[in-house]
């Protein structure tokens, strides 16, 4: 699928997955700016119970002027574009639409619509959107805010760029015209003091299963994206290859299941 194929529709909504992370926000922003450049008036939304409150994501949205909005209800659009997720995949609110499009880098877990572009071998969906924008002749380097968002999306989804394998991921890393000052702020804003206390309490009570070299971490109430950060920290322990971090949410249980051998490490499951 090419981004230009979306131009056949007028009432367009771009949907990020629930509990948005930097990658899905950046992807939605990229598609949003492309459609705006072509005279469309899209909306950028996400659903679910949780409103974005993680410090770095609030900063990302504010500093890069990303017009994302949280919704509980969506009037049926002509086209719903899922970014960094798939329709009925379980990690995003289900809204009705006349037509569905999917742009994703995860493994295919549901039936894909005709309008879809899924590249499961990429480290981040930001790389896919970046490449699709370049294919359409969109000047990503000329937009510092978008370049920074896509670079940060790649940065966070590839373990601070340490898990890059695909050449396209390397190309985005090397070519992105990002804002160094904003990147420094984002890198140093992963945790608030409150979240640090939650993470510390969880780590103190980690259960270790020696037979499987696995750690199980129960986490208190926090932004679900904190689960991935805790898992990353736990996996730095030499005796641990698998980490399951979880917490109880009003709508169920959130899991972050990470194995060090997986190329795409973070899997947030409801």
Label every PLM stretch briefly.
Residues 16-18, 48, 64, 83-86, ...:
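Fold-independent oxyanion-binding glycine-rich loops
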